[in-house]
Amino acid sequence: FNRIADMFPDAPFFYLSTSPWNVESSIRHFITNHGFPEGPLLLRDLDPRPKTFIPSGVQHKLEYAEQLMADFPDMKFILIGDDGQKDPTTYATIARRYPGRVLAIGIRQLSPREVTGNFGSVAGRVATQPMPVTDVPVFTGTTGSNIMKTMLPYLRAAQNGD
């Protein structure tokens, strides 16, 4: 991800997550310890009460992404997430609603162990999401490094007008 930061030195990194604010310090620790570029965290409020007006994680991510598009109308975005929740659908929606604003989409494919989590069975499985069809190039891989191996050459070519 630092290579993306090097390619686009004036572009900010936004970390948009469905995680609640009470885990902010853990996420910041992860970002720092793994050498990710600095950037603001956009997390969601946690409300333990059932059926409240606080948006779901998926709705939170879509609303924040749309707000970023509105706040930075001249900025283009690279969207990176995973297939464990609704990132593919959310990112395809953003790409369709804001044509020409999304340069690329990266989706990390979760491993079977990540999908089953601590449950260790299909009963505890989090359904992975396929990537909907979009006009934006989509790069997939099981790690961020895998995604970058194919995404970076594309971004370089796009940056050079090739």
Language-model features: locations:
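C-terminal cap/substrate-recognition subdomain and adjoining C-terminal extension
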Residues: 11, 19-162
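Glycine- and small hydrophobic-enriched segments that form the cores of compact globular domains
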Residues: 1-19
